[in-house]
């Protein structure tokens, strides 16, 4: 085998391993949202602390609901950052209270998650449904296949994971 063929075979093997692994990013990342990384640890922590507040859904698991909420918060922040817009903690807290999410304030992890998610409501209030949905859907999101896939039209992680375990905790 010539050196050129060996290099070509090596490149193909590396590409196949990358594709077969199922993860374009680190397994410790839940998603890449624009220029922001959402960690699996942040999703794990939110699942552990906030699952008790989730109403069961026939379509999404509590983990997917919470992962979607965490990722939506990051998506909203990307849109706000792109515009140079700021949303203070006090404004976020008002949005949380106004939208019936104050029960989540009793747990610090859930409070942080819902405060981030308040950016979504702010954009809908500011821009109206159509424009906000278009802006949020336009943000590039790459979800870790262990969570499922990101549905930009509905702004949710859905479907089954590509791996046998939902995901592993990282230290």
PLM feature spans:
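Short, low-structural-confidence N-terminal segments
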Residues: 1-61, 138-171
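N-terminal targeting/tethering segments
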Residues: 24-113
């Amino acid at each position: 085998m010539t050196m050129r063929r060996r290099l070509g075979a090596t490149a193909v093997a590396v590409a196949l391993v990358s594709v077969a692994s199922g993860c374009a990013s680190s397994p410790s990342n839940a998603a890449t949202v624009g220029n922001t990384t959402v960690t699996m640890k942040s999703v794990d922590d939110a699942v552990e602390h906030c699952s008790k507040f989730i109403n069961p859904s026939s379509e999404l698991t509590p983990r997917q609901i919470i992962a979607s909420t965490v990722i939506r918060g990051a998506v909203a922040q990307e849109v706000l950052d792109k515009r140079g817009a700021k949303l203070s903690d006090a404004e976020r807290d008002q949005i949380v209270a106004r939208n019936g999410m104050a029960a989540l304030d009793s747990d610090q992890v859930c409070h942080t998650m819902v405060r981030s998610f308040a950016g979504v409501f702010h954009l809908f209030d500011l821009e109206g449904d159509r424009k906000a949905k278009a802006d949020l859907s336009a943000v590039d999101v790459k979800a870790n296949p262990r969570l499922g896939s990101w549905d930009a039209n509905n702004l949710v992680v859905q479907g089954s994971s590509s791996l046998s375990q939902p995901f592993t905790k990282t230290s």
